[in-house]
Amino acid sequence: MEKESQTIFDKNVIEFVTVAAEFCAFLERAERMKRSTFVDTSLKILPLLYLKASMLPKCETIGDEALETYVTEEIYEILRINLSGLMADKDDYLVVFVQDMVYSDQPIKKSISEDLADIYQDIKDFIFVFQLGLNETMNDSLAICQENFGTLWGQKLVNTLRALHDVKYNQEEEEEEVGNEEGFYEPSDDNDCCEEDGCHCHDDDCHCHEDGCHCHDDELK
């Protein structure tokens, strides 16, 4: 028991708990954010969460009873729907690093909102039990969270990070291209425009070039 107590109060465990709690709180208030803010913050907190999880000391369960959970189906669905609404048309993405790819030669469609909700469920259940302050259950919740990091939510985190990176940087490129295409009308060179059949700049009584050609003034109005 003493060894388990030392593990749960390890510096790396405390740092992971801190980041994990902030991650959960961040997702819970995400529906009030702009998508750009949500994406930017996610791209910062997800790598940190992965880093802290990878630095956890080895931990094994010591109890036999199932641990309490916090995330119900209703809580999960509310969060997923909120995140899906926030991401809108940028929610879906293609992924190849999933077990189902063994049976398919095509990329599989996943969603950022569902992956984040899955990660949230593991992390929130861990935080809920850990904050109860009972050494044995704290230890076991840490062990389960660590195991699930390796087999479940760690890979989902990496996949989601790639998708969010694509949303942020490819979206900015698309917006820049659209902005360049909009443009505005630029009159032709005076001499070139005066070669058009409808131009009367070369009539004997024409004074167009005293102040520049005005052949296309009507087009600019």
Task: List the predicted regions and their residue ranges.
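Short, compositionally biased low-complexity segments
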Residues: 52-58, 87-98
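Charged, amphipathic alpha-helical oligomerization/scaffolding segments
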Residues: 11, 15-22, 41-48, 52, ...
